[in-house]
Amino acid sequence: FKFYDHPERLRIPLIKRNGVFEEATWDEAYNFIVSEFIRIREQHGPDALGGVSSARCPNEENYLMQKFFRAQVGTNNIDACARVCHSPTALGMQKTFGTGAATNSIDDLRDTHTIMVIGANPTDAHPVTGAKIKQQIMKGKTLIVIDPRRTELARYAHYHLQLKPGTNVALLNMMMHYIVKEGWVKQEFIDQRTEGWEDFKKEVLSVDIAAMERETGVDRNLVREAAKAYATSPAAMSFHGLGVTEHYQGTFTVMQIADL
């Protein structure tokens, strides 16, 4: 809680004038907001304005937020932070699995043999899950971490694919290329439960590994080893976080994780 009394914490409103933030009273700040809202609405119409609420707000505050924009401002331009964090997961999984929900519970960690964590730092962001993952790794299970950062879990990883930021799609393409090329697939499952296998197979086999290696900055041999560990494991689970979804490739990356 050191941030609470931190000297750099904002305690009074700031209004930018001539490119410089200047201190203002609360009345000045509220009057400025109101006057600008009115000016923009009169000049460009109500749809020139919009609001973004938050899942961290209670129902009452979110209700007031949407009511303000719809009834007072006169626009339906109201959204929430879930648009860039949860929605890519929901859409990606819906397109691949048919529903935007998790396929496993956290308790299934006990029954898995290999765990892949991509774009997530659960020991900091979700300590309970992070602790459960660490417990399983300490029992000898395999951990694959895909993250540009050296997170705490990366210290326990058997394979840390430290890719360049924004290259999730390329790296997952490499993994799928090796899995299909080497035949590390469960063909019976594919035949019975998937569609479009031949088109998918043709696409991933055409991946230029050398180009993907340059793009991601990850050695192809390390990617191949991680892909083999994941694909040949008797049971494997993957976890992804905001490092995947809060990205322009978010939905496509979630779809690739599902394909993997």
Describe each PLM feature range:
Residues 230-259:
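A glycine-rich, hydrophobic/aromatic-adjacent loop/helix-cap motif
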Residues 201-206, 224-236:
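Core structural elements
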Residues 44-53, 81-83, 187-193, 214-215, ...:
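Short coil/turn segments at secondary-structure boundaries
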Residues 182-212:
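Internal, active-site/partner-interface "lid" segment
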Residues 1-182, 196, 211, 219:
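N-terminal export/assembly segments and adjacent metallocofactor-ligating motifs
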Residues 156-157, 206-210, 240-244:
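Flexible glycine/proline-enriched surface loops and loop-helix/loop-strand junctions
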Residues 194, 220, 246:
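Conserved phosphate/pyrophosphate-binding and hydrolysis machinery centered on Walker-type P-loop NTPases
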